[in-house]
Each structure stands twice: as C-alpha cells, then as structure tokens.
Amino acid sequence: MNFGLRLIFLVLVLKGVLCDVKLVESGGGLVKLGGSLKLSCAASGFTFSSYYMSWVRQTPEKRLELVAAINSNGGSTYYPDTVKGRFTISRDNAKNTLYLQMSSLKSEDTALYYCAR
C-alpha cells in the first residue's frame, strides 16, 4: 500500500516535469490610434509544431476575448469580425515562435495580450 502511494506520487512528479510548458510574450507597448504593433510569443516545453495556437486578450473590464488562431502548420487562420483585416497571426515552427501583427489600432484594442496553446 505504501509502495503504491509512492509510485503514484513519483509518476505525478515526473509528469509535472515533462509538462513544463512555457510561453513568453514580447513586443507590447504604447501605440497611437491607427498605429501598428507586432507581438511575439516564444514557446518551449512542448512540440510547438504539433499544436494549434492562439492569441487572446484581457480587456480593462477583465473580459477575455479570442483575437486570432492558427493551425499547426500555419495554413489556416481564424479571426473574429472585431479584428479581421487588421490583425494577422503567423508562426515560425523552426523558431518555435508565434506572432501577431496588429495594425489600424483602435481604442478598443487596449488590452493585455496573451498567446495560448
């Protein structure tokens, strides 16, 4: 019984080490209305090229919004109407990096932006 508990604990600890997913965003800043900004997200701890990725934002009112998504090979993308034609999501699987090019920025684009797996 005691051995069984130790084994389960060991498996859980090892699983936690193997699942050390890290996503680090960069490129944010203050921009004038109508301006542009490019965000980057460096990924590690998982096989980046195997996953759909997305960008989400948290508004000043704490609401979460999906702003863009891309499939694993970059061949298919999705945008809600609020950003369509202004935002472009892309990825570089060789560099394990996700990008979000934002242009014609509006006041309602003010938010914290996060990449997500």
UniProtKB/Swiss-Prot annotation:
Disulfide bonds join C41-C115. This is Ig heavy chain V region RF. The keyword Signal applies. Keywords: Adaptive immunity, Disulfide bond, Hybridoma, Immunity, Immunoglobulin, Signal. One of its GO terms (cellular component) is extracellular region. It holds the Pfam family V-set. Residues 86-117 are annotated as: Framework-3. Residues 55-68 are annotated as: Framework-2. Transmembrane segments: none annotated. Residues 69-85 are annotated as: Complementarity-determining-2. Residues 50-54 are annotated as: Complementarity-determining-1. This sequence belongs to the VH7183 subfamily. Residues 20-49 are annotated as: Framework-1. Coiled coil: none annotated. GO terms for biological process: immunoglobulin mediated immune response. PROSITE patterns: IG_LIKE. Residues 1-19 form the signal peptide. One of its GO terms (molecular function) is antigen binding.
